[in-house]
Amino acid sequence: METRKPAERLALPYSLRTAPLGVPGTLPGLPRRDPLRVALRLDAACWEWARSGCARGWQYLPVPLDSAFEPAFLRKRNERERQRVRCVNEGYARLRDHLPRELADKRLSKVETLRAAIDYIKHLQELLERQAWGLEGAAGAVPQRRAECNSDGESKASSAPSPSSEPEEGGS
């Protein structure tokens, strides 16, 4: 318990409590506070030592990041992060709803969900190209094959066949 009278304790704003050492107007006799708001009892001998050659490289007390440790700030930050994670998870759930039914029974990770969605989209594109080729093929036009890109970052040689792809049709 503190033995000082309330008049002896002076609560200064944090910006004044982190003033450079040895600057006129600073009050080294006042109890300093750390970022967790616990009073630090430093007598005049400690302040002299801090100003001496032992601490030549340190001209300032450590500046506390006051707002980053406030409970309200932490609660708001954590709630924003929880909301962001909820939205991301909801997006993955909606994406899984659009995948073929054979994948609905499996528990897919986020990466597996993205890869399955990419494979399924490629499969649907191939079906559309085949359908377009079938319609235009009767008229004698040859469909132009667009350049293939691997948007999932894997090389073409390492990509496995799509779990949602249909078996190739037999010969003509």
UniProtKB/Swiss-Prot annotation:
Principal place of residence: nucleus
SMART domains reported in the protein's UniProt record: HLH
Compositionally biased residues, Low complexity: 156-165
Record keyword Transcription present: yes
Subcellular location: Nucleus
GO cellular component terms attached to this protein's record: chromatin; RNA polymerase II transcription regulator complex
Transmembrane parts of this sequence: none
GO molecular function: DNA-binding transcription factor activity, RNA polymerase II-specific; protein dimerization activity; RNA polymerase II transcription regulatory region sequence-specific DNA binding
Bridged cysteine pairs (disulfide): none
Biased composition (Basic and acidic residues): 145-155
Superkingdom to which the source organism belongs: Eukaryota
Stretches the record annotates as Disordered: 144-172
Domain bHLH: 72-124
Biological-process GO terms, alphabetical: regulation of transcription by RNA polymerase II; skin development
Tissues with expression: Expressed in skin. 7-fold higher expression in fetal skin than in adult skin. Weak expression also detected in fetal lung, aorta and brain, and in adult stomach, kidney, ovary and breast.
Alphabetized UniProt keyword annotations: DNA-binding, Nucleus, Transcription, Transcription regulation
Keyword Nucleus on entry: yes
InterPro entries: bHLH_dom, E-box_TF_Regulators, HLH_DNA-bd_sf
Function recorded in the entry: Could be a transcriptional regulator involved in skin development.
PANTHER family, sorted: BASIC HELIX-LOOP-HELIX TRANSCRIPTION FACTOR, TWIST (PTHR23349), BHLH DOMAIN-CONTAINING PROTEIN (PTHR23349:SF108)
Protein name: Achaete-scute homolog 4
The species this protein was found in: Homo sapiens
